[in-house]
Amino acid sequence: MSTLQVVQLINDQDAQVAGAVAAALPQLAGLVDEAVQRMRAGGRVHYFGAGTSGRLAVIDAAELLPTFNVPPGLVIAHHAGGASALITAAENVEDSVELGRSEASALREQDIAIGLTASGRTPFVGGALAVAREVGALTALITSHPQAELASSADYLLAADTGPEVITGSTRMKAGTAQKLLLNAFSTALMIKLGRTWSNLMVDMLATNAKLRGRVVRILQQATGVSDEVARDALAMSDGELKPALVHLLAGIDVQTARDLLARHDGVVAAALAEAAGPRTGRRSSDRAGGPVPAR
């Protein structure tokens, strides 16, 4: 095969992944809805994985802080072998049930434990999910095998059957891509339902550098239609926090009142704006949850 034929083959196989993921979406939606309720009650999300699965979990958890300003410790990735295994393969650690149990020792009843294993039988993940079941945590399994050995340990089975890999057994390929898509969809839908977006905008993002500070201004302009100068003035009054500035501009109220409304409604912009505008009839429950609404 020519090099072009090789990469075309890989790409053709990758194109099948989205369809495999689609089969797991009903289970994923149920997981998100139940996870939202648990997180509102003080629960945390814990990912457990080894090898590629663990690395993907670490990536997803790490990205939530800058994207949605999720406090550290709210979404936690447990990678078999720890930090050193992120850059140097440590394949043997995935075989330890006890290591998985140890990693899961901090789980509480209101938490959510999500195991990731392409094979559906990784002992490290099995140990973690066993502890999760013992304490009453919500459990889910992300895998490539619909008949996964660990399926009985999960309240929600997210099985994306991606089929044989281009390189037999190399689950970092299609199976890994499917896991990444499911993680993206889970964490993003979770943040939407928790009110950390407004329309399709990242209104809870953490602006930690020049690029992101510029993005905050543009997001505020896009959401409100104000000029660059007005947006910057509003952000200055809100100490750079996007949500209070947004409610201030959209509701025509002072920044402190905007902060108070947001605090009263768990940071959900739609609910804060609804109270600022007074009682309304026919407001959708999805708006109260901070779900996607038409762009403004």
Language model region names:
Residues 7, 11, 36-39, 48, ...:
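Catalytic, metal-anchored helix/loop core of enzyme active sites in primary metabolism
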Residues 185, 190-296:
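Short, amphipathic alpha-helical interaction segments embedded in low-complexity terminal/linker regions
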Residues 23-38:
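A short, well-structured juxtamembrane/interface segment
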Residues 17-26, 115-122:
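Short, glycine-rich nucleotide/cofactor-binding loops
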Residues 9-17, 77-87, 198, 239:
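Gly-rich Lys/Arg/Thr-decorated short loops/hinges at beta-loop-alpha junctions or inter-strand turns
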Residues 45-194:
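Glycine-rich phosphate-binding loops that contact phosphosugars or nucleotide phosphates
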Residues 1-20, 24:
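Cofactor-/ligand-binding subdomain signature composed of acidic, glycine-rich
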